[in-house]
A protein has these predicted regions:
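Long, positively charged amphipathic alpha-helical accessory segments at protein N-termini or as interdomain linkers
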Residues: 23, 31, 41-62, 66-75, ...
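Basic polycationic patches enriched in arginine
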Residues: 21-26, 33-36
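Low-complexity, glycine/proline/serine-enriched flexible coil segments
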Residues: 13-22
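Active-site glycine-centered loops adjacent to acidic/histidine catalytic or metal-binding residues
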Residues: 173, 236, 266
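N-terminal lobe of the biotin/lipoate ligase/transferase fold
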Residues: 2-5, 17, 40-221, 252
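Intrinsically disordered, low-complexity segments enriched in glycine and mixed charged residues
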Residues: 6-10
Length: 392
């Protein structure tokens, strides 16, 4: 649980964690954005009303049911019903005769009302209906097979760009090349994001880099990990040379256009590194798992982390639209492979595609490799293994 204790600009906000510099929700934004989200059908009236109640409780020491009902045009009984739902979602709300209701603690889980409040109150995120808005509709599940599978179904059903599916646990989580992705229930952050980009299939390589940039910037700047954050082509996010986040992008393509893209992101948020290493240990040439919580030395607020990731990804997608070359330059600042001796295969233990020194990425997002014979190869896909060399 995170105590509602920090006061920023006169408004109490959820304490995120040491290291995650969570911006206080902009309450002046929340109400207008809630109305717009309702008009667009991006959230239900119940979630919207409970988000309003949370915002009001955060903005005041305490409020009576009568005051809340009057402010929102609902009965005291309806107020009590909404508060009961919030309590069942993990919010600790104090109710005292003569003093009213006050919010004491927020849940660690990324429940819809808390995520909606943080999302709509974040000035970095465009408003619902504006280009670049991400995060709604929001689907929060206790357990699914895979959030990517859930999001693929939503995509085919016509859900709009920006739809997010989050799960506390996955029974069939997967990464690139059909590898198993393991995450601990209630500890880590696993979610999928639906995009409907106006891209040609050949441009998907740059989209991968843009998403990776957004995640890296969130961890480096918002979480405060700085130079400890790196990117291993194409989209592994490293912290202190260990893998802290995996990204899986799946797309539906019709001839010369991309219908939709589902971006699955798994972050080792609060698991300990010792809990993530399998019985067989880390394969040679591969990165051991890393944990954000271990790196910052405290638990991470998953709701705050999710919203910050979405805001950073939104900005990266805007950069991709406005200046594709800037995406490559941004990526190069995080490139953890450049200058390393690598082997590129069709899969772990698969057919060798290239061997040499990684030399950055091309304008289309492909990996540039300077091979031992002096040639230069360009590769749009493959599995990278870092080889041990003398002095390294």
């Amino acid at each position: 649980m995170y105590t509602i204790a920090d006061t920023v600009g006169g408004a109490q906000v959820p304490l995120a964690c040491a290291g995650l510099r969570q911006r206080a929700p902009r309450f002046d934004l929340v109400e207008n954005r809630l109305e717009r989200g309702l008009q667009l059908g991006l959230l239900t009236p119940g979630v919207a009303q409970r988000t309003r109640l949370l915002a009001r409780m955060l903005d005041s020491a305490s409020l009576s049911g009568e005051e809340m009902g009057s402010a929102f045009g609902i009965s005291r009984a309806a107020v009590h019903k909404h508060i009961s739902v919030l309590r069942s979602a993990g919010f600790v709300i104090s109710s005292q005769r003569g003093l009213g209701h006050s919010l004491v603690e927020a849940p660690e889980s990324p429940v819809p009302e808390l995520v909606t409040l943080l999302l709509l109150g974040d000035p970095r995120m465009p408003a619902p209906g504006e280009a670049g808005f991400l995060g709604l509709p929001y689907h929060h599940h206790a357990e699914v097979g895979s959030t990517n599978d859930v999001c693929r179904g939503l995509a085919e059903a016509g859900s709009p760009e920006g739809t997010v599916a989050v799960a506390e646990a996955q029974s069939a989580g997967r990464g690139r090349l059909d590898r198993i992705w393991c995450s601990r229930a209630g500890q880590d952050l696993t979610f999928s994001l639906l995009l409907r980009p106006g891209l040609a299939p050949v441009e998907l390589g740059l989209l991968v880099l843009a998403i990776a940039n957004g995640v890296a910037l969130c961890l480096a700047e918002d979480v405060g990990l700085g130079s400890a954050v790196g990117l291993k082509w194409p989209n592994d996010v490293l912290v202190n040379s260990g893998k802290a986040c995996g990204i899986l992008m799946e797309a539906s393509i019709d001839m010369d256009r991309v219908r939709w893209v589902v971006v699955g992101i798994g972050v080792n948020a609060n698991s300990r590194c010792s809990e993530l290493i399998g019985v067989g240990g880390t394969p040679p040439g591969k990165e051991p798992p890393a944990s954000i919580g271990d790196a910052v030395g405290s638990r991470v607020s998953r709701p705050a982390l999710l919203v910050s990731l979405l805001a950073r990804i939104s900005a990266s997608l805007h950069q991709l639209d406005a200046e594709p070359g800037a995406v490559v330059r941004q990526y190069e600042g995080f490139d953890a492979l450049r200058g390393r001796t690598i082997r590129l295969t069709s899969g772990y233990g698969g057919r060798e595609l290239a061997r040499g020194v990684a030399d950055g990425v091309e304008g289309d997002g492909s990996l540039r490799v300077r091979e031992a014979g002096g040639g230069v190869g360009f590769h749009g896909a493959g599995e990278v293994t870092v080889e041990s060399v003398a002095g390294e």
